[in-house]
Amino acid sequence: MTVRAYDNQHPEIDESVWIDPSAVVIGKVTLGREVSVWPQVVIRGDVNTITVGSQTNIQDGAILHCTHDGPYSPGGKALTIGERVTIGHQACLHGCTIGQEVLIGIGATVLDGAVVEDQVMIGAGTLVPPGKTLESGYLYVGSPAKMARPLKDHEKEFLKYSALHYIRLANNHREVTG
C-alpha cells in the first residue's frame, strides 16, 4: 500500500483499518475504525480534507477526491463519508457529503456539493450532479439521479449487512496475507 503525506499533511489511519497493497492514500485523509480499502482505490486528500467514517468499505478501483479553494469554488469542498457506507467498485466521490448506512452502486458518481442523506441506495452507474440532495430512505437511479422508490425494510437491513460483511472479509484478508 502507498500511504503518503502531501504538503506536510499526513493521513490519519486507525490501527484497525485494512488497506490493500495496491491502494493509494494521500494527504489530509482520516480513516475511521474498521474501514477497508480494496485493490486499486485512490483516496487523494491533496487539496482538501477527506474523512471516512467507521466500518465503511471502499471497493476496488473507487476514487475519492475533494475540491480545492479557488475562484470557482470558494473554500473548496471536503469529502465526508459517514459510518457503515458501502462504496461500490469503480465509484467516484468528489467533494460531497455521504450520510450513514449508504450504498453507492458500482460505477456511480457523486459530484461536488451533493448531499446523500442516511439510508440511501444509489444504483450502479448513477450520476448525482453537483449540489443535489438525495433524501433518506430511497433508491436513486439514472443520470441525473432520480428517486425511484422507497427502500424496503430488507434493503435497509442489507445496508448494515454489507458493511459488516466487508469487515469480516477484510479481517480474513489480513489473516491470509499476514
Residue ranges and their predicted role:
Residues 2-16, 20, 71-92, 136-178:
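C-terminal segments of enzyme domains that contribute to small-molecule binding surfaces
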Residues 15, 20-21, 26-27, 32-33, ...:
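Left-handed beta-helix
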